[in-house]
């Protein structure tokens, strides 16, 4: 018995049969959807924690030049923390969502 090579396969999509208009229609799908949302939030939170550790390390290593050298990591961290956390689902997206991408004119 050895370890299987490759990455494990996970169900990453929302559950089938969930109706957002009538969530109580299928209780099993409602619970699966709730678990899916919680799982996705935990993934976002853990990604933000990893980026925060990278920013700390970059600040420590770069010293006085951290404003220039760590800017990209800080931007990634700030983008990853927008909308992450509990209770932000019902707030307007403009307050916590990702910033809209600036489209360059041709």
Swiss-Prot record:
Mitochondrion is among the record's keywords: yes
Descriptive protein name: NADH dehydrogenase [ubiquinone] 1 beta subcomplex subunit 10-B
Membrane topology classification: Peripheral membrane protein
GO-annotated cellular components: cytosol; mitochondrial inner membrane; mitochondrial membrane; mitochondrion; respiratory chain complex I
Keyword Kinase annotated: no
Organism field: Arabidopsis thaliana
Protein task: Accessory subunit of the mitochondrial membrane respiratory chain NADH dehydrogenase (Complex I), that is believed not to be involved in catalysis. Complex I functions in the transfer of electrons from NADH to the respiratory chain. The immediate electron acceptor for the enzyme is believed to be ubiquinone.
Keywords: Electron transport, Membrane, Mitochondrion, Mitochondrion inner membrane, Respiratory chain, Transport
